Amino acid sequence: DESNLNVFNISNSNEPQFLKMVSVDYHVETIYPFENKLFIGSNNGMFIYDVESSPDSPVKAGEFTHARSCDPVIADQQYAYITLHSGTTCLGFNNELDIVKLNNLVDASLVKIYNLTSPQGLSKDGNLLFICDGADGLKIYNASDVSNLQLIKQFSGIETYDVIAFNNIALVVAKDGLYQYDYSDVNNIHIVSRIGLSNK
């Protein structure tokens, strides 16, 4: 919920069993699981919880504090990618991508900040980083060098909110519908389909 991590046993999906509530921070927004860690985004920062030794009782392993802002987060083996955006109830003023090195979870360090328009959801598949940048549309970067992201493709003309990239297909939630993009060829990333949303 807004300030706690609620742990459930879902081995029986018909009857989920509540196990524990772990206090995290005020205004928790997103949870991103990667390997044996949970990366939790809040208005004030990113919190890292270890679930390797005891999945039913997550233990705080580290955090990274940033300026107050709405905060989606994803991660890979080496870095966390955090988008901050303004113009919401989060009361922040930053519109940026923060890349944080995870070699020391207790003291995660900022690698670089990239200024954006109004970044929200993001996803990563291999070296491709997908960012929904609000009215600037979908931006796709080569992230092989996190200190020097290279923009490969931008799909403008749509207002994007969230993206899931998996197995060469990116599903993008936008203001006017659900878009599907094929990125099997990075030199020819293209739209596959769109399902429109009614404003009624």
Task: Name every feature range the model reports, one short phrase each.
Residues 120-156:
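Intrinsically disordered, low-complexity segments enriched in Gly and acidic/Ser/Thr residues
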Residues 95-101:
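Beta-propeller blade signature
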Residues 14-22, 56-64, 106-114, 147-155, ...:
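A short beta-strand motif characteristic of beta-propeller blades
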Residues 37-40, 80-82, 128-131, 169-172:
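Conserved beta-propeller blade signature
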Residues 2-4, 45-46, 86-91, 136-137, ...:
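Short glycine/acidic-enriched loop and turn motifs that connect beta-strands
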Residues 25-34, 66-77, 116-125, 158-167, ...:
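Repeated scaffold domains used in trafficking and secretory/extracellular systems
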Residues 10-14, 51-55, 102-106, 143-147, ...:
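Short loop/turn segments that connect beta-strands within beta-propeller blades
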Residues 164-200:
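Blade-level signature of beta-propeller repeat domains, shared across WD40, Kelch, NHL, RCC1
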